[in-house]
Design a protein with these regions (language model features):
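Short glycine-centered segments of the SAM/dcSAM-binding site in methyltransferase folds
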Residues: 38, 132-133
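A conserved beta-strand element that flanks and buttresses the S-adenosyl-L-methionine
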Residues: 103
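A short glycine-rich, Lys/Arg-flanked "PGG" loop and its adjoining helix->strand segment in the class I
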Residues: 118-130
Length: 189
């Protein structure tokens, strides 16, 4: 089941996006976040974020809803420190406290309702170890972003409510920052 249109997927697979991820997005999002040795990444899409994350921790488990994207990413990263699973972030197949950290990068807006977004946040809190951090980012609602998402799922996250939503999901401390047309968040279980 695809949650992105063709143009969006092409951009998220492009060298331009890879450069933005490595040089700007991940340094900003991960600033001050300790990933530990066992990272869960949800919604990696074609995996350009995964490519950077796998160099920052011993193990990465990537959960992707789209079966085709999950299969391609698993094939591309076979033999690496990344395990790719096709699955739903609102129903993760892992025991409580399994991961040292989680990354949720530019994907929350692809979850089709705030209630399901909250279910995803609660699942992420559940599978994190005590003291584990969720590091994430998302794009704000802009005309350009709406245009990029024509024909796919786009439910923007309100940064004004995100800290409270993270706490309700089971996180103790939460930080939310807005810069330009992006929001980053870090929450500790």
């Amino acid at each position: 089941m695809a949650t992105v249109n063709k143009a969006h997927l092409e951009f998220c697979s492009s060298p331009e996006w890879a450069r933005l991820v490595e040089d700007e997005l991940l340094p900003w999002v991960l600033d001050g976040c300790e990933l530990g040795d066992d990272l869960l990444e949800v919604g990696p899409g074609p995996g350009l974020t995964t490519d950077v994350l796998r160099g920052r921790t011993a193990r990465v488990t990537a959960v992707e809803l789209d079966l085709d994207l999950a299969g391609k990413l698993a094939a591309r990263l076979a033999g690496s420190n990344v395990r790719v699973i096709a699955g739903d972030v609102t129903r993760l197949p892992f025991p409580a406290g399994r991961f040292s950290a989680a990354a949720c990068l530019t994907m929350l807006h692809h979850i089709p309702s705030p209630a399901l977004q909250d279910a995803a946040l609660a699942e992420l809190a559940r599978v994190l170890r005590p003291g584990g951090v969720l590091a994430g980012s998302d794009g704000l609602d802009t005309p350009a972003r709406r245009e990029l998402h024509v024909g796919d799922v786009f439910v923007p996250v309100d940064p004004g409510t995100l800290e409270g939503r993270l706490r309700t999901a089971g996180f103790g401390r939460a930080r939310v920052d807005v810069a330009g047309d992006r929001v980053r968040f870090a929450a500790t279980r």
